[in-house]
Amino acid sequence: ITLSEEEKMRLIGRIDRIDTCERQDKLYVKVIDYKSGYRRFDLAALYYGLQLQLVVYMNAAVEMQQKAHRDKKVIPAAMLYYHVSDPMTDTDKGQPDPQEIQDAILEELKMTGMVSDEEEIIQLLDKDFTDKSKVLPVAKKKDGSFTQASSVLSQEDFHVVSDYVNHKIRELGSEILAGDI
C-alpha cells in the first residue's frame, strides 16, 4: 500500500477461504474468515478502524481475481465470518424432530457479515433462499424488501466501504510511521 512517494506498507495475512462463481462475463467473490468466537460485522467499528480485516481480505481477493481473470468483471458477493463451533441444541421438549434439530444447528452456524443485495447473487450463495436464509444474514419481508436485520450492501456500497478501508489503512500506516501508535 503506497503511503507516499517514498513510503510503502505491506500487509501480510492469510484469507481462510475464498469462493468464486463464474457467470458469463462476471466472477463473483465470497470471502470467509473463520473465527473461534462469535463475531458480527460492525460498520461503526469499521469507521473507527477497529474492524478492517474482513474488508481488507475482500479487497485483496478481488484484486487477485481481477489479475487472474482480466476478461471478467469481478464482483464482491459476500464477506462473512463463520463461527467455528460444535453447536448444542435444546432437547428438553421430549423427542425432538430431526428437522428441528437440523434447523437449530444451521441457525447456530449461520454466518455473519455483509452480503450483496442482488437477488441473483443471493441465490448463488444460498440455492434454498426464499424469504429467510438458513446460512446467510439475509431475510425478506412480505413486500420483497430486506428486513432491517439483514446485512446487505449494494455494489455501490461495497465499493464505498472498500475505498474507505483503503483510505483508513493508509491513514493508520502514516500514523504508525509518524510514531503515533
PLM regions with names:
Residues 1-181:
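RecB-family 4Fe-4S metal-dependent nuclease core
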